[in-house]
Amino acid sequence: MCIRDSSNTSVWFDTSGKVHFGHQSTDSPKEATTGFQLIVSDGKLTVGKGGPRHPRTAIGANESGEILWLVVVDGRQKGFSEGMDMHELATIMKELGCWRATNMDGGGSSVMGLINKSGEMKIMNSPSDRFLGLKRIRPLPMVLTIRKKSS
């Protein structure tokens, strides 16, 4: 299922593991999720300069869809990170080599974890979500999990 809202875009992986972005699947997706707007399309930035700086999450791929980038930007933490506006995020994604990239849910939802060989998860960034003044990992109904392909 792909989102048909013109302001959102779907991200899906085909059966060969290549990533695709857009509103219509050209192949039956094996896995899919939705993001917000495309910030890089056909190697060009699609967002203007300025706007608010927030924690951000983005997913992007090279032109062939064989290399995937997941980026999390911390924010709302004075003296540590103020976040990025959409143009800054799009610029980073393009500089990484993304042909297409989309903005995902951000703010306190911007968290990146890594599971080590022992099966323990380590949070790799400094999430901005707070509850009763305490920093926490926001409970989320959906996460995007990427794992190494089995040999």
Residue ranges and their predicted role:
Residues 1-151:
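Gly/Ser/Thr/Pro-rich low-complexity, intrinsically disordered segments
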